[in-house]
């Protein structure tokens, strides 16, 4: 699963996601993409599950680009522990995704196969998404 090799700080503030994506809202690599329509924190496990669903459906054909990287440590206190006594230990890694952000890109497969693959990936994510396609000139 994706996670940073090293970080400046062990724990991070919870943070909020305000407004639309300030970058990464256009297709850069592939012909097709999956765009987020809602703000949400997406975990490394969810990204990996979506990637596996796509690659299996495409039968390893084409190319997949993951445009998001989980760089925010999410801490969690153990179960049945009383409140207080400090912040919990880092449990997982997540990425804050703003609306409009392109999360995955595909290339080298037909449009119908790409749409199905990205729809399967979308089912693994906790947000509403949209299939987008590069305009042919």
From Swiss-Prot:
InterPro entries: Ribosomal_uL16, Ribosomal_uL16_bact-type, Ribosomal_uL16_CS, Ribosomal_uL16_dom, Ribosomal_uL16_sf
Keyword rRNA-binding part of the UniProt annotation: yes
Pfam families: Ribosomal_L16
CDD domains hit by this protein: Ribosomal_L16_L10e
GO cellular component term of the entry, any: cytosolic large ribosomal subunit
Xref: PROSITE patterns: RIBOSOMAL_L16_1 (PS00586), RIBOSOMAL_L16_2 (PS00701)
UniProt keyword annotations, A-Z: Ribonucleoprotein, Ribosomal protein, RNA-binding, rRNA-binding, tRNA-binding
GO biological process: translation
Gene Ontology MF terms in the entry: rRNA binding; structural constituent of ribosome; tRNA binding
Homology family: Belongs to the universal ribosomal protein uL16 family.
Function recorded in the entry: Binds 23S rRNA and is also seen to make contacts with the A and possibly P site tRNAs.
PANTHER family (UniProt xref): 50S/60S RIBOSOMAL PROTEIN L16, LARGE RIBOSOMAL SUBUNIT PROTEIN UL16M
Subunit structure: Part of the 50S ribosomal subunit.
Protein name: Large ribosomal subunit protein uL16
Gene symbol of the encoding locus: rplP
């Amino acid at each position: 699963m994706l996670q940073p090799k090293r970080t400046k700080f062990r724990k991070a503030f919870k943070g909020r996601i305000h407004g639309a994506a300030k970058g990464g809202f256009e297709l850069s690599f592939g012909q097709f993409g999956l765009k987020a329509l809602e703000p949400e924190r997406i975990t490394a496990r969810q990204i990996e599950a979506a990637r596996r669903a796509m690659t299996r459906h495409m039968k390893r054909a084409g190319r997949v680009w993951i445009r998001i990287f989980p760089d925010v440590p999410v801490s969690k206190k153990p179960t049945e522990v009383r409140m207080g006594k400090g912040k919990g230990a880092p449990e997982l890694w997540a990425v804050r995704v703003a609306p409009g952000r392109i999360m995955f890109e595909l290339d080298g497969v037909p449009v119908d196969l790409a749409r199905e693959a990205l729809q399967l990936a979308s089912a693994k994510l906790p947000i509403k998404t949209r299939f987008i396609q590069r305009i042919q000139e």
